Amino acid sequence: RSAILTGQPIWRLEEAGNLWSTLPKKFITYPEVLNKAGYLVGFTGKGWSPGRLSAGGRESNPAGKEFKDKKLKPSFKAMRNIDYAANFDDFLGQVKKDQPFCFWLGTSEPHRGYELGAGKRTGKDPSKVLVPGIFPDNSIVRNDILDYYVEVEHFDKMVARAIRSLEKIGQLENTIVVVTSDHGMPFPRAKASLYDAGTRVPLAIRWPQGIRKSGRVSHALVNLSDLAPTFLEAAGISVPKMTNGKGHK
């Protein structure tokens, strides 16, 4: 998340290259730049985390102002009670007329701690699971993947609600929507590994007014540290000199 926010690889970010650390204030983040340019910036759920920002000289989360008041009753035990989409609505309610905005919707789901058997209880069929070749193919693995899918669906529903909110206020066609992840699925040889399942994360971008030849599927190698300069270039804002990610406007 530090790399996404700063547009820099983790080996340049000192303490921020480690988990449960801090993000030194000297490293500029794209929400900070957008905020100075007049954007309303905010986040819900996971912004920059986990760690102690005060140790790096920061007083607030570099992802923006936190929106966290809206709660829900989770469908399953392991899910958090944050209503991410409703918090996004609260954020939109603070956007002034003609003010540009940037929001980070950071769900914790999918995350380990799945409720055992959640997949089967929602009617999913273990026999239809495509088991990656790096895992043993047995009932334990198949059902574990189904439980993972339940949390993926929870994420999907939150994104769908957020998109509908943009549509309601007439800003969907004028908004860059990026859906991605900070790491691979939380399974062996995936999250925290350099295997494909650990580094090959989803990335979908929608911007009808700005993307040429939309509807494409690309297999190009992309680094998520390139998102920060891409956002700033798309907004017509100068990219900080310390940023060494490359924009893909």
What are these regions (language model features)?
Residues 1-249:
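Formylglycine-dependent sulfatase
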